[in-house]
UniProtKB/Swiss-Prot annotation:
The protein, known as: Arsenical pump membrane protein
Segments traversing the membrane: 21-41, 46-66, 98-118, 121-141, 152-172, 178-198, 228-248, 249-269, 274-294, 311-331, 407-427
Function: Involved in arsenical resistance. Thought to form the channel of an arsenite pump.
Keyword field contains Membrane: yes
Membrane topology: Multi-pass membrane protein
Organism annotation: Escherichia coli (strain K12)
GO molecular function: antimonite secondary active transmembrane transporter activity; arsenite secondary active transmembrane transporter activity
Lineage: Bacteria, Pseudomonadati, Pseudomonadota, Gammaproteobacteria, Enterobacterales
Family statement: Belongs to the ArsB family.
Subcellular location: Cell inner membrane
Periplasmic topological domain residue ranges: 42-45, 119-120, 173-177, 295-310, 428-429
GO biological process, one term: arsenite transport
Amino acid sequence: MLLAGAIFVLTIVLVIWQPKGLGIGWSATLGAVLALVTGVVHPGDIPVVWNIVWNATAAFIAVIIISLLLDESGFFEWAALHVSRWGNGRGRLLFTWIVLLGAAVAALFANDGAALILTPIVIAMLLALGFSKGTTLAFVMAAGFIADTASLPLIVSNLVNIVSADFFGLGFREYASVMVPVDIAAIVATLVMLHLYFRKDIPQNYDMALLKSPAEAIKDPATFKTGWVVLLLLLVGFFVLEPLGIPVSAIAAVGALILFVVAKRGHAINTGKVLRGAPWQIVIFSLGMYLVVYGLRNAGLTEYLSGVLNVLADNGLWAATLGTGFLTAFLSSIMNNMPTVLVGALSIDGSTASGVIKEAMVYANVIGCDLGPKITPIGSLATLLWLHVLSQKNMTISWGYYFRTGIIMTLPVLFVTLAALALRLSFTL
């Protein structure tokens, strides 16, 4: 256990610290090699882990490529400028619409896309409106927060969701039927908390005349228009084709290919830059990181956690839901959500829970790993990258400020979301 734990801690430190620009993929690979050399994992574990991660990572990359292409076409700026007009010059209404836009983008383009793509657009828009630094910080924090709390509804909304759905064989429709209503509760709770926390920083009014026309944001009309068609086809494909056995990654890849071909023909978008910007290292990161996590499983960590989950399961649906969700949220906040979701999945699989209790634990694990990272900056790689993007925009958020805000905001939203899950699953009893 000590050796497996030491390798895991070393890997996490390298992934978060990234000394001398060392990519997350190579850090995870180093951890995996150490685990193999020391016998913590065995060569036979490699195909097992690959079977867990391949569909998730491929789907995630395809969705991010679609997001990047649409961003280059002006799609997201166009949407942001439209919702800013729906605010009708009222600050609180603008704040609400920006949060709801972030929720929609997170649902369709994954949490990473929502946080990293929307943030620079929101900053530019707020600067154009002449908002203060405090107001800009409030809007930026809101955009970053909703990106994770609203990344629950669809399998493709978060890499965590895809990994868990693949592990437990959850279909797209089955997953959405449970998590869409839960996500609505999460969005409402997030909106309430954001308005309460940042109430002093949201301006009463703003001058809509300072905003440019949404049409001016469109840089590649062909890619912009095709994007709407691709989104519709993706949603239909996910709900219709995935139940027939076609992987989510294959459906997403076709959508990315169609959009890429259109963008390539238009010459307005640097498609080479888009491909270089795709998170290719996530492939070797997922395989390497999960091999290291599998070492923890081989060393008995997940067996210990299974015992904890058994106690929760014995106390009924609500205890299982709330207990699992808060446990995995805490683990995500201190050891990153990507390894945590697999630790949680392996522990649930090894527990004696069955029926609706096990189902509750599976979804609570997803919720904990989606929302838990908002407590600390190290909870997710997307948050670390988001903070880096902000620093490049001369907006530095200290880890202390992030933690204070994160823990106050996250715990109530997490509780409401888990309670919504327990209520939703109560109807299946």
